[in-house]
Amino acid sequence: MTQRHWLELTLIADNDDDVLLLETALECAGAVAVTYQAANEEEIFEPEIGTTPMWSKTGVTGLFPLDTDPNAVIELLMQALGEDYPIAQHLLPESDWTRAWLEHFQPIAFGNHFWVAASEHVIEEHDAKVLRLDPGLAFGTGTHPSTAMCLHYLVNHAALHGKTVYDYGCGSGILGIAAAMMGAKAVYQTDIDPQALTASYENAQKNQVAEKIFLCEQPDLAPAVDLLVANILLEPLCALRAQFEKHLHAQSVMIFSGLLERQQQKLEQAYQDHYRIERINCRAGWILLRLTSL
């Protein structure tokens, strides 16, 4: 049998405008995903809200579907770019891609018989609830400490039966799907990345909770909810306070993660006038905060 391959093509951008140009060209040529990586040793720390700064030299990599013809794609790129950008190509065998991902992503238990696992993994625990996730378009598999802490809270401490939840910055949809599986009656999800909403919908269907999930392309479409979960960065958490408050009632709870320990004070400065703020978990320098109205 002939081995099938994914195709990775990488181009180097010298400035932010080139990054956007190359990303657009790769997507127009059929890339199913585009990622950025440093082409040197330069580091970028947390950017200002509303900005996406790049390295001085940025590798822009497109991942193309199985059995893509590299020569045809490169020809399309050259036509679109109008100049000769060096292109590095790499063929990734389908089996290697799947095997590498499965080796990296092992089943994770979060207590209360709840697991996150790939479709290929077998969970033998009796009465287990298993949230199935596979390689996809958006971030969020439960391996990062901030996501893991959110999941642990939803599974063990949130008492979600019959409640409404807003998963703000949903990524793969993992948190909202977990809430639905733990008994929430309605879960609203939003994200600034349209691919995240696509991934959330597909994952909700896979986990048979799609009837409870409501995707909001516009954040304002969600109503007031019992629990708002936001696993995003410090600056958006601070900047979005007014937006979050549109979706709260007097007894609502907010759960924030995506924060480092050293950032808690700044978050408190943005919320402490009207909210009681509790640190309820900490892992590997990341924290989970619970906010309730004073």
Swiss-Prot record:
Residues that bind S-adenosyl-L-methionine: T147, G169, D191, N231
Subcellular location(s) per record: Cytoplasm
Gene Ontology CC, one term: cytoplasm
Top-rank taxon: Bacteria
Keyword Mitochondrion carried by entry: no
Keyword S-adenosyl-L-methionine applies: yes
Listed InterPro entries: Ribosomal_L11_MeTrfase_PrmA, Ribosomal_PrmA_MeTrfase, SAM-dependent_MTases_sf
Catalytic activity: L-lysyl-[protein] + 3 S-adenosyl-L-methionine = N(6),N(6),N(6)-trimethyl-L-lysyl-[protein] + 3 S-adenosyl-L-homocysteine + 3 H(+)
Family: Belongs to the methyltransferase superfamily. PrmA family.
Role description: Methylates ribosomal protein L11.
Name of this protein: Ribosomal protein L11 methyltransferase
Gene responsible for this protein: prmA
